Curated annotation (Swiss-Prot):
ABC-type transporter; part of the gene cluster that mediates the biosynthesis of erinacines, cyathane-xylosides that show unique biological activities, including leishmanicidal activity, stimulating activity for nerve growth-factor synthesis, and agonistic activity toward the kappa opioid receptor. It is a multi-pass membrane protein. Belongs to the ABC transporter superfamily. ABCG family. PDR (TC 3.A.1.205) subfamily. This is ABC-type transporter eriD. Gene3D superfamilies: P-loop containing nucleotide triphosphate hydrolases (3.40.50.300). It comes from Hericium erinaceus. The gene is eriD. Its main location: membrane.
């Protein structure tokens, strides 16, 4: 490789020029002079190039003995031989007077169907640039982080941590930096850094977005290749560099074993959540950016892995000069001690910036006390919670309390003066646009490929090649979509071809040939419609990689198009080959390949259009409704349903810009031009007309000439469609033009239009319930309530709230010898092994253990929530077995905070109280109890706030409190289970949740709570502990004791090493039993427990409870019911809640209304006031037919809502026995009813009157009856659509799968409804398919709507529909046709003429109805049939849900 003479450490770990330089120089000298005999000494690498292979296992990342520090020193030694050839670049940063602000409201009102349009003035203000109220997010920040330094950012959620990191990284979407703010990246200005050198300063969010079907190795290899430098170590190719760097980061982050495992996501099985987090970290590490901002990147990692992550940053800083800024919400002392500097944030203000080892003493000197065993990070963060910080004795009234007071104290401190001096020295050393900028540019230039433009490392062709390779890997990893597409297209082609099988070579096939080619071109055109969804799936990943400067988004777009091309060719060939030859289209090679060429061109044009729609819209819901109307317009104005001649003047332009129209014209010309078709039907014909001269009859087809037995194909398409042979190849050029235009718009949109970003969090209230004066904290993006322009301080936690009214529990729940076995891959596996314990009222019991020890499984088993496996053992309440009401009488707070997004806090709790408290309790009493719980949980300020989604609604802590509240208001009579209530929370929020649990326990609640590695202070909140080791084996059950003394004494008595005074007893205890990563137990503590005195005391206590049961109170049968509320009460509340949810989701309702209104207004005005000519009546039929096409979009709107409802029900509400599954299914159907009725009304007025069918009713004096029946039929169509959607999705996991099934079934019902082909006549499909014609609900709907719309009205012919012929000599036209007209409908314009007879084939619309197998007499029969279909859908929806998703009895085998 020519560009391979030299190499820098490049994107990976460039050497540092400051303190590390001296170290490296000395290191290099000592290594160079070292003797060969010492090559394996840990301090002295041997000078070999690890990229080219090495015998030293400590330098080989795949050896299992890899030492990153030794490897790093070896690279630096090699590079030190040519400092000019391997220049490095660093990006330290200083900032002063840094203030950040946004615009918005601290609270917002909830949008509903009723108030949606009241926000139009606000929208107008936004458009005019009036941004609303200014909100200060960060105020007057100052700091400096030099190269090789690490800064930890501490603060509660909402304090501004995320905003500070984003500001440093230049990701300022949604907020603004004040003009007087100054940021200096070591001599590079803020603007220049983020324009020219994007990717050198990067921000890593806590979300993990990757392509789920790619393996970990492929994902990281891609990142390594994208940042491979041009100058590398001698002899190292690009491929070797990328492969070795991938291996190195995988070894550092413990991912080597996952190299061939898919990354996965919530829907695709792959690596674990913690491993996925490490993949994200490794990907950023490979970018080698000199300044890295990490936002809560340790969330989801255990403490050992989090420590390894921070150690890897330390290594990068020490030897590469990298600068790291890290926000961590729960930092152990070991993690904190790795940082050089710390900044503490309090409500958007800086209250400390300086050395990490001085911060604690700074605040102690200020007058605060750090409790024993509290980590420094927790101590610093606790200062920002007035209810938690502790003044030292004598300092109670002198320490700062509010954010403003803390900020003032910091500004007046000596530490701050020293910081200002340091910033000044830094800025003097690195003036903007000075010497360091030139060094930085030079280093970047050496790294970049030749021809690459900053800020990307690779040139554009190299980026495209790399993205193409990745696209192929993604395709090979998941070929299911491709194979489904090919097989599905093949089967659909067989079905369509069988309907039009072997068309005759006469004029009777004209309509069928046109319909077949129309359907074929539409199937080709819409084959790429799912590409919109694909764009949204990969968009977050592409945008992330753009921020990391890995590649241009348009490079990925080009690669995606190229990779999809072979698949499109194969899938379309499978479809078109079968369809073309089975149906007897023109059988010549040239004709087939011309047909295929235009079909393929249509696919490519529409692919570009779909991609453009996806790339230009910011959200998927934004894309759906408008694109549906646009696509419908393309279908209507193709030229088949409305020939170009009949298109109304206002809409003719749509055909001119319609690529499908040009493709359709060319394949019609290809089929008909240059061919003659024998006439299949003459006028007149029949008895008495067999021997008439040729000039006295004419073929009943457009383009016919009297006197001829054949019709020229070119004449037919010219007359019927105004299509001309000379346009065929012209249209190909036009299609190429469309492809080029939409390819450009697609590439432009991918490069410049970003997906919508979330706002900073604000509370959302119902309109009329917004607090008049909202006081809150910061509007930082990671959490928190919204803020106003002025900040007021948060109230301290009320630790003594009145809780007297809360339900007290009196029963003790106890379990003995609980065993749980399941089969994994056919092999039995024990998850729980003889677990004993109890929970008494008024106690808080912690359930702890190693990851995989069975904590959640034990909770599920005790709560009677496991659905498979074998459970053994005794689980009793006061000595009695659990009854059918057990699940209803226990509260279970799950780890996931699942709530209905549109409910308010109060409504969510009322719903739980009404359905889970006994039915005999008056509603007023339930409401009063809810208010008590709201007060207890300190939720008064946001009781009327909408739950919402993260970003717009409750924050993490508020959601957790609501989850607990929903269970409390159910008045659980037995106990409360909690699964990881502090998981993912910052330390202060975790503390407030544990304080709340303590408060509940003090009030008599019995609580069993799993908790993962709590801090020493959190651990002390609990009374008792049940500790499990791997395999579900108990190693301790008993009291914790004051300062954990009891449990420490127990384990020390069993031979454990003494617990250090400063250690966290919870972490010490886990390491003792070998549950902490890397720890090994000295003995089997399960056996030690079984042989201990404490174990015998537990067994004795359990025996006493078992043998002395408390007397059972004489409960009513109501108390033992599975559900507290009767069926009708459940149905009322659940249906009302679902109706309310839809009312509060205006985007769903209005997109439904817009879809229905837009589509049908388009149809109505496209077929405006259709006349009762032959073509006009066809147009009226097509207006019904086209109206059915909204079916698919309506179904796809309903399904995702159902899946959301179902996940909430199945995960939280069904296990707690709130209401039955039948109620759930019926409420979903009934809740849609009002909105479907409204949509039906809109559809009726937007379609019925513009098309002009009411005029046919006027003639028959049945305006009211026919108009009313038409509305009822439309209403039935809406109900059928809704119930059909519920039937399909009821038993299916994914709305995507349900949508695919719906599309297939819709295509079949659409094909067999009798419009494109019928059961008899010239357009008849084979008799085999007659059953589909009778099964299709659209058969009856179309027949009823068309007959009600056009029956019993007079009809006539347009000029081109009149057939001309000569009567026999001596006869008038009337005499000649008298016999023919006696048995056939028709009229003569000139019955007395003796030449040029002008005959129209219809006088009444009923003859048209007869031709399409419709009858007005069947209208009420069809109306009844449609109700049968609707009721069948409802019944099958309930049945499928029961069959697929309702546990049948219980699959759990219970053994005593």
């Amino acid at each position: 490789m020519a560009e391979n003479e030299k190499v820098t450490y490049g994107g990976a770990l460039p050497p540092s020029p400051s303190t590390a330089d001296t170290e490296v120089a000395a290191l290099a000298r000592s290594m160079t002079n070292a003797s060969r005999s010492s090559v394996y000494s840990p301090e002295k690498p041997d000078g070999t190039n690890p990229f080219l292979g090495t015998d030293d296992p400590r330098m080989d990342p795949l050896s299992g003995k890899f030492e990153p520090e030794r490897w790093t020193k070896a690279i630096l030694q090699l590079q030190s031989s040519d400092p000019e050839g391997y220049p490095h670049h660093t990006a330290a940063v200083s900032f002063s007077d840094l203030s950040v602000y946004g615009y918005g409201r601290p609270t917002d009102h909830q949008k509903t169907v009723g108030n949606y349009f009241l926000d139009i003035p606000g929208l107008a203000r936004d458009i005019l640039g009036r941004k609303g109220q200014r909100i200060d997010i960060l105020r007057n920040f100052e700091g400096v982080i030099r190269e090789s330094e690490m800064l930890v950012v501490l603060g509660r959620p909402g304090s501004g941590c995320t905003t500070l990191l984003k500001t440093i990284a230049g990701e300022t979407h949604g907020f603004w930096i004040t003009d007087n703010s100054h940021i200096n990246y070591q001599g590079i200005s803020f603007k220049r850094m983020h324009k020219q050198f994007r990717g050198e300063v990067i921000y890593n969010a806590e979300n993990d977005v990757h392509f789920p079907n790619m393996t970990v190795g492929q994902t990281l290899r891609f990142a390594a290749e994208a940042r491979t430098p041009r100058t590398r170590l001698p002899g190292v190719s690009r491929s070797q560099w990328a492969e070795h760097m991938k291996d190195v980061v995988m070894s550092i982050f413990g991912l080597t074993h996952t190299v061939n495992t898919k990354v996965g996501n919530d829907f695709v099985r792959g690596v674990s959540g913690g491993e996925r987090k490490r993949v994200s970290i490794a990907e950023v590490a490979l970018s080698g950016s000199p300044l890295q901002c990490w936002d809560n990147s340790t969330r989801g990692l255990d403490s050992a892995t989090a420590l390894e992550f921070v150690k890897s940053l330390r290594l990068s800083s020490k030897y590469a000069g990298a600068t790291a800024v890290v926000a961590i919400y729960q930092a152990s002392q070991a993690i904190y001690d790795l940082f050089d500097k710390v900044v503490v944030l309090y409500e958007g203000q800086q209250i400390y910036f300086g050395r990490a080892d001085r911060a604690k003493q700074f605040f102690i000197d200020m007058g605060f006390e750090c409790p024993p065993r509290q980590t420094t990070a927790d101590f610093l963060t606790s200062l920002t919670n007035p209810g938690e910080c502790l003044p030292r004795p004598g300092f109670e009234g002198r320490v700062p309390r509010t954010a403003d007071e803390f900020a003032a104290a910091w500004r007046n401190s000596r530490d701050r003066q020293e910081l200002l001096q340091e910033i000044e020295r830094f800025n003097d050393e690195f003036p903007e646009d000075g010497e360091h900028l030139e060094k930085f540019k030079k280093a970047r230039k050496l790294i970049q490929a030749k021809g690459s433009q900053s800020p990307y490392t690779l040139s554009t062709p190299m980026q495209i090649r790399l993205c193409l390779k990745r696209a192929w890997q993604r395709f090979m990893a998941d070929t299911s979509n491709f194979l489904t597409s090919v097989i599905g297209n093949f089967i659909l082609a067989l079905i369509i071809s069988s309907i039009f099988y072997n068309l005759p070579q006469n004029t009777l096939s004209f309509y069928s040939r046109g319909a077949l080619l129309f359907f074929a071109i539409l199937m080709n055109a819409f084959a790429s419609s799912l590409e919109i969804l694909q764009i949204y799936e990969q968009r977050p990943i592409v945008e992330k990689h753009k921020r990391m400067a890995l590649y241009h988004p348009y490079a990925d777009a080009i690669a995606s198009v190229l990779c999809d091309l072979p698949g499109k060719v194969i899938a379309s060939f499978a479809f078109n080959l079968v369809l073309y030859f089975m149906t007897n289209l023109r059988r010549t090679p040239g004709a087939f390949f011309t047909f295929y060429l235009f079909s393929l061109m249509c696919i490519l044009v529409m692919s570009m259009i779909f991609r453009t729609i996806g790339a230009t819209s910011k959200t998927i819901s934004q894309a759906m409704a408008p694109s549906s109307v646009i696509l419908l317009a393309l279908v209507i104005f193709t030229g088949f349903t409305i020939p170009t001649r009949d298109m109304l003047g206002w809409s003719r332009w749509i055909n001119y810009i319609n690529p499908i129209g040009y493709a359709f014209e060319s394949i019609m010309v290809n089929e008909f031009d240059g061919r003659e078709y024998a006439c299949g039907d003459f006028i007149p014909t029949g008895p008495g007309y067999t021997d008439v001269p040729a000039t006295s009859r004419v073929c009943a087809s457009a383009g016919a000439v009297f006197g001829s037995d054949v019709v020229e194909g070119a004449a037919y398409i010219a007359t019927a469609y105004e299509y001309f042979p000379q346009h065929k190849w012209r249209n190909l050029g036009i299609l190429f033009g469309f492809i080029a235009f939409f390819a450009c718009t697609y590439l432009f949109a991918t490069e410049f239009i970003a997906a919508s970003k979330s706002k900073g969090e604000v509370l959302v209230f119902r309109r009329g319930h917004v607090p008049l004066k909202k006081e809150g904290a910061s509007e930082d993006e990671e959490a928190g309530t919204g803020s106003t322009g002025t900040r007021t301080q948060e109230e301290p936690v009320d630790k003594d709230a009145n809780i007297a009214g809360i339900q007290r529990q009196v029963a003790t729940f106890h379990w003995e010898d609980v065993i749980y076995d399941i089969k994994i891959k056919g092999q039995p596996r024990r998850i729980l092994d003889h677990v004993d314990g109890w929970v008494r009222p008024g106690t808080l019991t912690a359930l702890m253990g190693a990851s995989g020890a069975g904590k959640t499984t034990l909770l599920d088993t005790l709560a009677n929530r496991v659905t498979m496996g074998v459970v053994e053992g005794k689980m009793q309440v006061d000595g009695h077995d659990r009854d059918s009401s057990f699940q209803r009488n226990t509260g279970y707070v799950q780890q996931q905070d699942l709530h209905l997004q549109t409910s308010t806090v109060r409504e969510a709790m009322l719903f739980s109280a009404r359905l889970r408290q006994p039915h005999t309790v008056p509603d007023a009493e339930k409401a009063a109890y809810v208010e008590e719980v709201i007060h207890l949980l300190e939720m008064q300020k946001y009781a009327d706030a909408i739950v919402g989604v993260p970003g717009e609604g409750l924050n993490v802590e508020q959601r957790k409190r609501l989850t607990i509240g929903v269970e409390l208001v159910a008045k659980p009579q037995l106990l409360l289970f909690l699964d990881e209530p502090t998981s993912g929370l910052d330390s202060q929020t975790a503390w407030s949740i544990c304080t709340l649990l303590r408060k509940l326990a003090n009030n008599g609640q019995a609580i069993l709570c799993t908790i993962h590695q709590p801090s020493a202070m959190l651990f002390q909140s609990f009374d008792r502990l049940l500790l499990l080791q791997r395999g579900g084996q108990t190693v301790y059950f008993g009291d914790i004791g004051e300062n954990s003394r009891t449990i420490i004494d127990y384990f020390e008595g069993q031979g454990a090493d003494p617990c250090p005074h400063s250690a966290n007893p919870a972490e010490w205890m886990l390491s003792v039993i070998g549950a902490a990563p890397g720890a090994v137990a000295k003995r089997d503590y399960y056996e030690a427990w079984r042989g201990s005195e404490a174990y015998r005391a537990v067994k004795e206590e359990l025996r006493q409870m078992r043998e002395n049961p408390k007397p059972i109170s004489q409960e009513s049968t109501d108390a033992l019911r599975v559900y507290a509320a009767p069926f009708h009460v459940q149905l009322f509340h659940v249906t009302f809640r679902f109706y309310q949810q839809l009312y509060r989701t205006p985007s769903y309702i209005y997109s439904k209304i817009f879809l229905v209104a837009g589509s049908n207004l388009l149809i109505g005005f496209s077929f405006f006031n259709a006349h009762n000519t032959i073509q006009g009546l066809q147009n009226q039929m097509y207006s019904v037919f086209m109206g059915l096409t909204v079916f698919g979009n309506l179904v796809n709107q309903i399904m995702p809502h159902f899946v959301t409802q179902r996940s909430l029900y199945e995960v939280r509400e069904r296990p707690s026995r709130a209401y039955s599954w039948v109620v759930f299914m019926l409420s979903n159907v009934l809740g849609e009813l009002p909105w479907n009725t409204l949509a039906g009304v809109v559809l009726f007025f937007c379609w019925y009157y513009p098309v002009g069918m009411y005029r046919n009713a006027e003639v028959t004096h049945a305006v009211t009856e026919r108009g009313g029946l038409m509305f009822l039929l439309i209403w039935q169509f809406m109900l059928f659509t809704s119930t059909f959607a519920h039937m399909l999705i009821a038993g299916v996991d994914s709305d995507v799968t349900g949508g695919n099934i719906a599309s297939l079934l819709f295509s079949l019902t659409f094909l067999f409804c009798g419009v494109l082909a019928g059961p008899s006549g010239p357009n008849a499909f084979p008799r085999f398919w007659i059953f589909m014609y009778r099964l299709s609900p659209f058969t009856y709907l179309v027949e009823a709507m068309v007959s009600v719309g056009v029956a019993n009205a007079p009809a006539f012919c347009s000029d081109i529909e009149v057939r001309h012929f000569e009567p026999p000599s001596g006869e008038t036209c009337g005499q000649y046709l008298q016999q023919y007209m006696s048995v056939n409908d028709g009229s003569l314009a000139n019955p007395n003429a003796t030449a040029d007879c002008q005959f129209c084939q219809q006088t009444t619309t009923n003859s048209f109805l007869t031709g399409i197998h419709s009858s007005y007499a069947h209208r009420w029969r069809n109306f009844g049939f449609l109700w049968v279909f609707i009721l069948f859908n409802i019944g099958m929806a309930v049945f499928f849900y029961w069959l697929a998703r309702v546990p049948k009895g219980s699959r759990v085998k219970k053994q005593k």
